[in-house]
Design a protein with these regions (language model features):
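Glycine-rich, highly charged phosphate/nucleotide-binding loops
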Residues: 81-101
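Hydrophobic, well-ordered beta-alpha structural blocks that scaffold small-molecule cofactor pockets
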Residues: 11-13, 17-82
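ADP-ribose/adenylate-binding Rossmann-like module
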Residues: 105-111, 116-143
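Short loop/edge segments at beta-strand edges and connector loops
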Residues: 72, 90-94, 134
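Residue-level detector of alpha-helix initiation sites
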Residues: 52-53, 113-114, 160
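Structural motif
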Residues: 44, 104-105
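E1/E1-like adenylate-forming module used to activate ubiquitin-like modifiers
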Residues: 132-182
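An accessory alpha-helical subdomain
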Residues: 160-248
Length: 248
């Protein structure tokens, strides 16, 4: 049995008995995570729980254009407003297993252990992505703290060990990496079309972009100094030093 599935079953057994010795949580810290970014545009996402935590999860999904269904007998005012304006679909009732049908992922954000377990077990039967807030063994994906600036996104994860530590790291990383890096990412993206059309191999394109990013002068420092025109000039100079191969 996979480590994740075993840890989840063990955690369910402990929770149903009203105990949790945290051994299953400790086991999860040794489980390697496959880091990925999901495109949620138009995908059906389920959030169970209408409190402040549910609000946080709903807003995260909406920010990525997910199609969100909320299931909860009641909800905080902000979630009620999202439902009124049509940003989310709100099923004002208790969770039912059928709520998982057709969903891409599910997030359980309730204070009721039985409900959270039901969401987890139903998602497991359907081989769905599932996150039960603050119960890492009942998650087959976790939600890292995210630093977002323009196209730049940096994820910070402690594998569920300490969300508070991840949030502190988020603040510190945002202070170090942020707007200058995001603006450089935009400038480099503008050159991607030229690179794909002109440079025939992945190695050529890798060398082109790494030469700019790691070059002298440092493009990030130029942006910090307000010299974005100089960054564009660097990119143009790099293009000239990487001419298209002659036709055979």
């Amino acid at each position: 049995m996979p480590a994740q599935a075993y840890a989840g079953k063990e955690c369910v057994c402990q929770l149903r008995k009203g105990i949790c010795d945290q051994s299953c949580v400790r086991d999860m810290l040794s489980t390697p995570l496959y880091i990925a970014c999901l495109r949620l545009t138009g995908r059906e996402c389920l959030v169970v729980g209408g409190g402040d935590v549910g609000l946080e999860k709903v807003e995260g999904l909406l920010a990525c254009d997910g199609a969100v269904t909320l299931v909860s007998p009641d909800a905080v005012p902000e979630l009620e407003a999202y439902a009124r304006e049509g940003s989310i679909r709100w099923e004002r009732r208790e969770f039912a297993d059928s709520d998982l049908d057709g969903k891409f992922l599910a997030i359980a954000a309730t204070s009721m252990t039985d409900v959270n377990i039901s969401v987890y077990e139903g998602a497991e039967r359907r081989a769905m992505l599932c996150n039960v807030v603050d119960v890492p063994p009942l998650c087959n994906f976790i939600l890292p703290a995210i630093v977002r600036t323009g196209p730049l996104a940096i994820a910070i994860s402690t594998a569920g060990a300490s969300p508070a530590l991840a949030k502190r790291m988020k603040r510190e990383i945002a202070e170090t990496y942020g707007e200058p890096y995001a603006r450089l990412a935009v400038a480099l993206n503008d050159a991607r079309g030229w690179a794909k059309a002109t440079l025939p191999t992945y190695r050529d394109r890798k060398e082109f972009f790494e030469g700019i990013v790691n070059g002298d002068p440092d493009p990030v420092e130029l942006i910090r100094a307000g010299r974005e025109d100089d960054v564009r000039a660097l990119i143009e100079a790099a293009k000239e030093s990487h001419p298209a191969p002659a036709a055979s």
